[in-house]
Amino acid sequence: MGMSKSRGCFGYPLSIFFIVVNEFCERFSYYGMRALLVLYFRNFLGWDDNLSTAIYHTFVALCYLTPILGALIADSWLGKFKTIVSLSIVYTIGQAVISVSSINDLTDHDHNGSPDSLPVHVALSMVGLALIALGTGGIKPCVSAFGGDQFEEGQEKQRNRFFSIFYLAINGGSLLSTIITPILRVQQCGIHSQQACYPLAFGVPAALMAVALIVFVLGSGMYKKFQPQGNIMGKVAKCIGFAIKNRFRHRSKAYPKREHWLDWAKEKYDERLISQIKMVTKVMFLYIPLPMFWALFDQQGSRWTLQATTMNGKIGAIEIQPDQMQTVNAILIVIMVPIVDAVVYPLIAKCGFNFTSLKKMTVGMFLASMAFVVAAIVQVEIDKTLPVFPGGNQVQIKVLNIGNNNMTVHFPGNSVTLAQMSQTDTFMTFDIDKLTSINISSSGSPGVTTVAHDFEQGHRHTLLVWNPSQYRVVKDGLNQKPEKGENGIRFVNTLNEMVTIKMSGKVYENVTSHNASGYQFFPSGEKQYTINTTAVAPTCLTDFKSSNLDFGSAYTYVIRRASDGCLEVKEFEDIPPNTVNMALQIPQYFLLTCGEVVFSVTGLEFSYSQAPSNMKSVLQAGWLLTVAVGNIIVLIVAGAGHFPKQWAEYILFASLLLVVCVIFAIMARFYTYINPAEIEAQFDEDEKKKGIGKENPYSSLEPVSQTNM
């Protein structure tokens, strides 16, 4: 064992402050990056909701599978310190790679605002995420245990407080990052064109990871560094493998039965190890239903974020971005953990109710299930406000009269008459095979003009008319609400020459006469824009201001010549803004956070209390593995489900967890609590009597009651 001399501050080893700061920065880096992923996949890489959700949960699953690799490296090869440093370097490189992958100008050679080679961005993103998963997962089982190693015997009180501080550092980093990085994302940046600033939003977490690494290395001279003492997970696996093999070798009736299947390892392994593995397998058996909880919990960053994009983020004077709603969980965690520990549990105990660890975990599962019932109710309310878009064999048409006369448009079975500068109230829906003819007429002009156009099924179209014989059909290109709560704006030019419009850093270039531009998308708020044209006198006003944009709307701005010869702009609503407020997500976040506090914190404490001293790392890896399996469950459901309504998927998850909750309650009913310390003390006593007096070579890992490891 190699160690440095321990220096103290307020009764704590000075080294632990470097570890706490490192953990704060690392969690800021991880959660700041993770908060952006789903919207980055959908809006930058152009993936649909299901693929975005699937890749997101694949990444999270990898982050919770790699701790097994990290524990193996630390235990059998590098030790905790070198493992943390080495994998933190990998982690930092991964964060830098994904930041570079989000630079639009990397492949935007024609400077049109869109990447010319999306596969390059996808490849870089996947490489970055793979490196991050290896780095963050690999250091997970090492950092908290390394912090525990810094304390001397007799410092149990300080060690327990350290883990509380460590837990708050994790949630503090998570909270700040999920507030800050979405703000950075909505900024506009770019060399040749302006887009959502993903490079900055990913770059700040990358910088924080570099800071985390530097801070950790600066404390190197103060750390106690234990040499690797052998791979206990390997010993456990070999013992279990030998027991199974030996049992099948001796399965005939000629061999007497043994009390436990692990007793078949006695020919090769000592009773202490076998007894310790029995304790671990009892807890591991209880882990079997747990992934279902994580399958629901980790959807905060995917489905719930996507749900928030269809809601209104104005809460009083505050304006919240969809990916910032995840901060509600971190805020509630910081508030509720001390309240539950100091108030709720003591009150329950005073009432005489034996609220055991497994009962707490059962309640946590139930609360998470109810959170998804609430999410389903909110989704039903959202669905009521969403516009209806055309089906596969339908088209939708809106008529916009941009002329100076009244116009009548005749559809099969229906006619609409529009005054000058007006549009139909809604999009009209037609089956494509029944849309046989469309005719335009005007009371001031003789004759009827037939609209000759092949409407594209499954899409919305705008029919621009300005006199009975002149019209233009424009395919809108919007078949859903604008993504990430932004607002779509397009311009219609009624002048006799081309115009160019600049709005908040984006350019609508060369919009031809009596034609419409494509939509461009902007966050909420008022937007300044300038119309460049030579069609009006230099003294005329060319700078204008939009209305106060809300969330998820779309508008058409018609540019026309006013009576004084200058320009005027009229606004028409294409898609109404979101009306269901994001505040309605708070109850589901509250229920899920309550479930997290009583499930996750209790689960780790229970696992460690029931584990032998030298196998706490084994159970820590097993606990993290349940998170990985939970994300794999989401992958399977998202890939195979394809529910027509999102609320139905929420109800499915709630029902599955409720069933699992009942199963877990039954399993918990038959579980017998043990005291591993007493069992190990008995082995020590027996060995002393036999004159063996072996010292257990494996140091214990202290439990860390935290949910965001």
Curated annotation (Swiss-Prot):
Q: Please indicate the ranges of residues that lie on the Extracellular side.
A: 22-53, 104-118, 183-198, 298-327, 383-585, 642-646
Q: What is its main location?
A: membrane
Positions with biased composition (Polar residues): 697-709
User: Which ranges make up the Cytoplasmic topological domains here?
Assistant: 75-82, 140-161, 220-276, 349-361, 607-620, 668-709
Q: Which Gene3D superfamilies match?
A: MFS general substrate transporter like domains
Could you tell me which SUPFAM superfamilies the record lists for this protein?
Answer: MFS general substrate transporter
Keywords associated with the record: Cell membrane, Glycoprotein, Membrane, Peptide transport, Protein transport, Symport, Transmembrane, Transmembrane helix, Transport
Q: Which reaction does it catalyse?
A: a dipeptide(out) + H(+)(out) = a dipeptide(in) + H(+)(in); an L-amino acid tripeptide(out) + H(+)(out) = an L-amino acid tripeptide(in) + H(+)(in); L-alanyl-L-lysine(out) + H(+)(out) = L-alanyl-L-lysine(in) + H(+)(in); L-alanyl-L-proline(out) + H(+)(out) = L-alanyl-L-proline(in) + H(+)(in)
GO biological process annotation, one example: protein transport
Q: Which domain of life is it from?
A: Eukaryota
- Annotated consequence of substituting residue 550 to A: Reduced trypsin-binding
Membrane topology reported for the UniProt record: Multi-pass membrane protein
Where would I find glycosylation on this chain?
A: 50, 406, 439, 515, 532
Q: Which Pfam families match?
A: PTR2
Compartments where located: Apical cell membrane
Q: What does this protein do?
A: Electrogenic proton-coupled amino-acid transporter that transports oligopeptides of 2 to 4 amino acids with a preference for dipeptides. Transports neutral and monovalently charged peptides with a proton to peptide stoichiometry of 1:1 or 2:1. Primarily responsible for the absorption of dietary di- and tripeptides from the small intestinal lumen. Mediates transepithelial transport of muramyl and N-formylated bacterial dipeptides contributing to recognition of pathogenic bacteria by the mucosal immune system.
Subunit structure and binding partners: Interacts (via extracellular domain region) with trypsin.
Q: What note about domains is in the entry? A: The extracellular domain (ECD) region specifically binds trypsin.
Name under which the protein is recorded: Solute carrier family 15 member 1
Classification of source organism: Eukaryota, Metazoa, Chordata, Craniata, Vertebrata
Record gene name: Slc15a1
